[in-house]
């Protein structure tokens, strides 16, 4: 079994970061090979949400460099934390992850992420589990940090008051 822990500080309040993780509108296309499709939205706070994710995996797994996971979310505490359980492929694996948002004040949040990963097949577990999980985790860390910081910038820009351009004609 592999364990991955990651923490990153981002420019955004826990509420802003939460709104990005739990966004339920149309998804923006990505060039990173990552997509998240909501299969079931869960209750009003997201408890029971089910999602299908695609992500990059090493090409030597002969899947065209694409992995899949089916994830369900539980233990949801709005603007604070959630847990997910997942089944994924290739390597047919089980994962469990937890995300916690720590308010640092001054509009900043530290995101704590922990995941355990276990390939079902004992031969593939011995040969590939560590390398594959390291590849996926490294990619996720970079993508999450970039996406959250970019998303918070877009949220704040959308909320910023619009200023009217000054008239080119002077009033008498």
Ranges and model annotations:
Residues 1-46, 170-172:
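Hydrophobic ligand-binding cavity/cleft-lining segments
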Residues 46-56:
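Short coil-to-beta transition motif at edge beta-strands of beta-rich domains
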Residues 2, 49-51, 109:
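Short beta-strand micro-motifs in enzyme catalytic cores
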Residues 45-47, 92-93:
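Short acidic/glycine-enriched loop/turn segments that link adjacent beta-strands
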Residues 7-11, 54, 72, 100:
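Generic structural detector for well-ordered beta-strands
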Residues 116-172:
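A conserved amphipathic terminal alpha-helix motif
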Residues 29-33, 58-112, 116-118:
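Hydrophobic-ligand binding "helix-grip"
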Residues 23-25, 76, 146, 150:
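Conserved short hydrophobic interaction patches
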């Amino acid at each position: 079994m592999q364990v991955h822990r990651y923490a990153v500080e981002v420019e955004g309040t826990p509420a802003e970061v939460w709104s990005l993780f739990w966004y339920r509108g149309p998804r923006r296309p990505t060039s990173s090979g990552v997509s998240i499709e909501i299969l079931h939205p869960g209750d009003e706070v997201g408890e029971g949400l089910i999602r299908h994710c695609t992500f990059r995996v090493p090409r030597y797994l002969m899947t065209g460099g694409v992995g899949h996971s089916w994830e369900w979310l539980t233990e949801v505490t709005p603007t604070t934390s959630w847990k997910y359980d997942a089944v994924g492929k290739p390597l047919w694996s089980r994962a469990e992850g937890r995300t916690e948002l720590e308010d640092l004040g001054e509009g900043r949040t530290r995101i704590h992420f922990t995941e355990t990963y276990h390939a079902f097949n004992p031969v593939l577990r011995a040969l590939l589990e560590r390398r594959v999980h390291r590849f996926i985790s490294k990619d996720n860390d970079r993508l999450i940090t970039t996406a959250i910081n970019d998303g918070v910038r877009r949220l704040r820009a959308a909320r910023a008051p619009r200023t009217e351009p000054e008239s080119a004609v002077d009033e008498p």
